[in-house]
Amino acid sequence: MQQKENLVEEMGVHFERLFNLPPLAARIYILLLLSDRSGLSFDEVRDFMDASKSSISANINLLLQGERINFLTKPGDRKLYFKPSPRFLNIRLEESLGLLKKETEIVNQIMTFNTENNINGFEEVQTKLEKYAEHLQEVQEKYIKSLDYFHENN
C-alpha cells in the first residue's frame, strides 16, 4: 500500500503540471489509473485520499467533465464506480498535439515577422528557428500516427 501511496503522490505532482489539474484531482486520476479496472467506489476514493466528501466530489466531477474518467454501476449495487476513461491516452495525445501546433504557429509568426521587418541580428537565430520548426513538424507527425493507432484500436 505504501508503494501505491508513493506513486500516487509522485505521479500526482507530475499530472498537476502536465494536465493543469488541482492536486486532489491529479491524485484521484492517478489512483484510478493504478487500480483495478472494475473501478473504485466514491468511498474507496475518499478513504484512500483522506479528504472531505465535498472535495472528492468536486474533483471527481472535474475529471468526469474533462472526460479523463468514467463511471459505471454494478448490478444490484447503487454505488457509482469510477475508472479511467478508455480514451485517456487519446486525450493526452490530442492535448499535446494542440500545444505543438500552437508552438509551430508561434515560431512561424516570429520568423515571418523578423524576416519582413529586417530585425537586426535575426540571421543568427534564423537557422535554429527553422530547424526547431522542422523538429516540431516531425514530432506532430509522430503524434498523429500514434493517435491514428489509438483511434483504430480503441
Region annotations inferred by a language model:
Residues 1-27, 153:
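Short alpha-helical segments that sit at the start of domains
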Residues 19-24, 41, 74-94:
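Short, cationic-aromatic polyanion-contact patches
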Residues 33-38:
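Short helix-capping/hinge SLiMs at alpha-helix to coil transitions
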Residues 44-47:
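A short acidic, leucine-rich amphipathic alpha-helix
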Residues 52-53:
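Short coil turns linking two alpha-helices in DNA-binding domains
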Residues 67:
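Glycine-centered, phosphate/nucleic-acid-interacting loop/turn motifs that mediate DNA/RNA or nucleotide
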Residues 115-154:
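C-terminal regulatory/oligomerization modules of transcriptional regulators
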